[in-house]
Amino acid sequence: MFRRRGVTLTKALLTVVCMLAAPLTQAISVGNLTFSLPSETDFVSKRVVNNNKSARIYRIAISAIDSPGSSELRTRPVDGELLFAPRQLALQAGESEYFKFYYHGPRDNRERYYRVSFREVPTRNLTKRSPTGGEVSTEPVVVMDTILVVRPRQVQFKWSFDQVTGTVSNTGNTWFKLLIKPGCDSTEEEGDAWYLRPGDVVHQPELRQPGNHYLVYNDKFIKISDSCPAKPPSAD
């Protein structure tokens, strides 16, 4: 279970690794950092945008993980279970293209998680003199981590909400996002976003009070309380 302060923020699951300690004003863009492969399909696409002023090469590395989080266990995916194409992309400044992911694993009732790392590599090696006299790269390699969730082929989207105790439970076998906004006129920044995996439970006093509370599942909003007029927030 993950908590995100500010329902419009998706800072979790993002890791930017630089070979040079310099600010990254422009870099790779991949959209939402958590994306899902629906139960009824076998492939999903992810758009990559080159926001730099020069060309870049993009490559992918995939690890199977037991569950997203700081203590996750990474393993090599079973051969042929999750494939992607193309092997790499070469994009000029401002260009974009798609990587496609193909799932050929078990068609059961278990949800599976993969950490997908997008690696952005400069096509040229520009250097400058460091204060110590050596040379350092002025165009760093950037790695952005995302999470791909393969929903169960036999999916069960189930949940429960107890307003008396302020509890939302994921009683199914696939993840969803819970948006909690205290009060009917609160801003996006005042809300919280929780990512609930199967079996996760959220206890929050705000859930006992009037507010705009939603579940987000497959990009659809599900209002779980009737205390405020319906006005879906952003899913980002």
UniProtKB/Swiss-Prot annotation:
Which keywords appear in this protein's UniProt record, sorted alphabetically? Chaperone, Fimbrium biogenesis, Signal
Q: Which InterPro entries match?
A: Ig-like_fold (IPR013783), PapD-like_sf (IPR008962)
Q: Which residues cross the membrane?
A: none
Signal peptide interval: 1-27
| Induction remarks | Negatively regulated by H-NS. Positively regulated by IHF and EcpR.
The superkingdom of the source organism is: Bacteria
Keyword Transport among UniProt keywords: no
Which segments does the entry list as coiled coil?
none
Q: Which SUPFAM superfamilies match?
A: PapD-like
Q: Which family does it belong to?
A: Belongs to the EcpB/EcpE family.
Described by its record, this protein's role is as follows: Part of the ecpRABCDE operon, which encodes the E.coli common pilus (ECP). ECP is found in both commensal and pathogenic strains and plays a dual role in early-stage biofilm development and host cell recognition.
Q: What is this protein called?
A: Probable fimbrial chaperone EcpE
From what organism does this protein derive? Escherichia coli O127:H6 (strain E2348/69 / EPEC)
